[in-house]
Design a protein with these regions (language model features):
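Ala/Thr-enriched low-complexity intrinsically disordered regions
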Residues: 2, 11-14
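Adenosyl-5′-phosphate
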Residues: 15-19, 183, 192, 213-220, ...
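Cysteine-centered catalytic environments shared across enzyme families
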Residues: 16-350, 362, 366, 564, ...
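Active-site adenylate/phosphate-handling loop in enzymes that bind or generate adenylated species
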Residues: 157, 364-423, 507, 512, ...
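Glycine-rich loop motifs involved in handling phospho/adenylate chemistry
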Residues: 275-284, 309-310, 357-360, 385, ...
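Short low-complexity, flexible loop/linker segments enriched in glycine and/or proline
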Residues: 344-348, 370, 392-394, 585-587
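Membrane-proximal basic amphipathic "stem/tether" segments
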Residues: 397-450, 636
């Protein structure tokens, strides 16, 4: 949460930089909910150990936790409007607050502080809910209208800041983390079977669902209005759409990217403490650090994680980039024993099953960074907006095939994978591509490619009655497409642009940004993502696909923009990211640890499984017959949630 809200005495200053979590409860009765909200605040103290703010009145209370990056008097929330009608708490950063403040001041508003909290509230008083579409930043906002007894919640357009809510007979509650909801007295929780299936399909629960049937995430770019005696009203204030710009020469696109990128990074580096960066040595993180060194007047601190296995170790690439850019660089190595020891703690940070393989190294690099800085920049979002994944290149190839060949490829994709582990990693990727080739559009192929398990594997390990509750498996892709994109005419004709819209709707808020938020907040570290700044998103949604994908090479414009800043060849290599060597680890001690979790956590006793089939996957993987590491990793994390995180129903 930002609260550059010090006394406004006419002195210009960058202001207080704070981050936090917010929580609240609108009770059905007229009791005092402050004690319950204080307990919620205590459960997210890691998001802000320095300060607590609470507001309460009969039937309603909300609170926040704050980490002060510079503690200036007046940064404390809640923030009240001059007439005392509105009370605000929010979590985030508003980068264009100065411009909005000037506009409001020109209209006659007199400000009492120097910060963005008051600007949001003043904007809401003047423009109503329209203010949220004017904010450039990352935020989760809660505004209580004392006169109308109305609560308004809003979340930033791409979902950088989280916000969960639950509407139950005991009341309406919200929180920055799911675990804070589960502590409320009188609230009851059951596991959503569709969320369970989602998890084993995608490796995370699809937004807006959570693992609990009674809780939801507020979708990015949405407002939720809650009034007593009425159903909560959900409205979208921003929807991603491609708005192609007039044709420009390639070199002008590169210059536009470079200029926008430098401005965005400079904007997100404003702080009264040192700002660091995650550096994997790949294109996006290198672009972040290269820009930071150009807009900062002091050395940049960079951080990376290495692995003993050279096939997965990027630390030497990161160190080469750091040396070229002159950063103060820190590398730590994460081995099998360390990862296994960390996994229970990391899994608990999410309060629901979450199985991105890079969650452990991301958690670890956040811990390393938090030892030296309070703010770090990350390159997340670059692959999604500028076509950096393998799926973008393969989609171009598949999309160029005549329809009969695509349907033939889909039939080939049904052939079982080869029984050799080293070949199997590549074969499985191409099998997913082939299996999706005959699907009718880019959105459908995106959902097929994003899955971490095949329909065949799910039929093998899950009980038929569990799978049946989701309907005919042959129609699952069509159902997903209809859920996220009911208006197909709003989609771009370019399938890669459809991929980007899918990432903005599903993968970024549900997986990538969730991973980074929980990993960093566990260590009271603020992570900012300049690739997902408003101007960068607008640029990406206006840029032609040809500037992003050059044949089979993604992020063309990013490569060309940063080429003058780094020695040639530093980032022309195979993409890795902070990934763990799962296949090899599950063949040894890590696999035995996961199998122990499966047998002892209670998950095996659920009626959703074909238990002997799951037992067989462990044996097949150990024997090198099949690579089941993605499913087994998801299962291990699920077992940890089952045993340790899940609240009592």
């Amino acid at each position: 949460m930002t609260g550059r809200d010090g006394p406004d005495n006419g002195t210009a200053f960058t202001g207080v930089r704070i981050i936090c979590g917010i929580v609240g409860l609108l009770a059905r009765g007229e009791g005092d909910p402050v004690a319950a909200v204080r307990r919620q605040c205590d459960s997210i103290v890691h998001r802000g150990p320095d300060d607590e703010g609470l507001y309460g009145e009969p039937g309603f209370a909300f609170g926040m936790r704050r980490l002060s990056i510079l503690d200036i008097a007046g940064g404390h929330q809640p923030f009240r409007s001059p007439d005392d009608r509105f009370v605000l708490m929010f979590n985030g950063e508003i980068y264009n607050f100065a411009a909005l403040r000037a506009e409001l001041a020109a209209a006659g508003r007199v400000f009492r502080s120097s910060g963005d909290a008051e600007v949001i509230l003043a904007g809401y008083e003047r423009w109503g809910a329209e203010v949220f579409g004017r904010l450039d930043g990352m935020f989760a906002v809660a505004i209580w209208d004392r006169q109308a007894r109305r609560l308004v919640l809003a979340r930033d357009p791409v979902g950088i800041k989280p916000l969960y809510y639950s509407d139950q007979p005991a009341g309406f509650a919200f929180a920055s983390e799911l675990q804070a909801l589960t502590l409320l007295p009188g609230f009851h929780w059951t596991t959503d079977p569709r969320a369970q299936l989602d998890y084993f399909r995608f490796g995370h629960v699809r937004t807006p669902r959570t693992i609990h049937a009674e809780a939801r995430t507020l979708p990015p770019g949405h407002i939720l209005t809650v009034t007593r005696g009425a159903e909560p009203e959900l409205t979208a204030y921003w929807t991603p759409r491609y708005t192609p710009a007039p044709p420009l020469p390639p070199e002008e696109w590169v210059e536009r990217f470079r200029r926008t990128w430098l401005d965005t990074v400079a904007e997100q580096m404003v702080a009264d403490v040192e700002v660091g960066a995650f550096l994997s040595g790949g294109i996006d993180s290198s672009a972040v650090v290269a820009a930071m060194t150009r807009v900062s007047d002091r050395p940049v601190r960079s951080f990376t994680i290495g692995f003993p296995d050279p096939r997965y170790d990027e630390s030497r690439h990161a160190e080469a980039v750091a040396a070229a850019l002159g950063t103060v660089h820190t590398t730590r190595t994460l081995d099998l024993v360390g990862a296994q020891d960390l996994l229970p703690t990391v899994a608990a940070s999410y309060a629901e099953p979450f199985a991105d393989p890079s969650m452990v190294p991301t958690w670890y690099v956040s811990r390393v960074a938090a030892e030296q800085v309070k703010v770090a920049l990350s390159g997340d979002g670059g692959d999604e907006l500028f076509f950096g994944y393998k799926r973008h290149a393969t989609e171009r190839r598949v999309g160029a095939l005549p329809a009969p060949l695509r349907h033939a490829a889909r039939a080939i994709g049904a052939v079982p994978t080869l029984p050799w582990r080293r070949a199997n990693e590549t074969v499985q990727r191409w099998t997913r591509t082939a299996a999706s080739a005959g699907l009718p559009c880019g959105v459908s192929r995106f959902f097929a490619k994003l899955q971490i398990t095949s329909p065949g594997l799910r039929a093998q390990v899950f009980a038929p009655e569990f799978l049946a509750m989701d309907g005919d498996p042959r129609g699952e892709i069509a159902r997903l497409r209809a859920e996220y994109f009911p208006n197909s005419t709003a989609l771009s004709a370019d399938t890669l642009e459809q991929f980007a819209l899918c990432d903005l709707a599903l993968n970024l808020p549900g997986a990538m940004l969730t991973k980074v938020d929980r990993a960093s907040m566990a260590h009271s570290l603020e992570v900012r993502v300049p690739m997902l700044g408003q101007k960068m998103v607008e640029l990406a949604l206006a840029m032609p696909a040809a500037m992003k994908l050059d044949g089979t090479t993604g992020k063309k414009v990013v490569r060309q923009a940063i080429a003058p800043w780094l020695p040639a060849g530093l980032f022309d290599r195979r993409k890795q990211g902070f990934q763990m060597p799962l296949s090899a680890w599950f063949a040894g001690d890590f696999g035995r640890y996961a199998e122990m979790l499966w047998r002892e956590s209670g998950a095996r006793d659920e009626g959703i499984w074909r238990r002997s089939a799951v037992d067989g996957l462990f044996a097949d993987h150990r024997a090198g017959k099949r690579d089941h590491s993605r499913f087994l990793y998801a299962l291990a994390v699920y077992c940890l949630w089952k045993a340790r995180v899940r609240p009592a129903s």
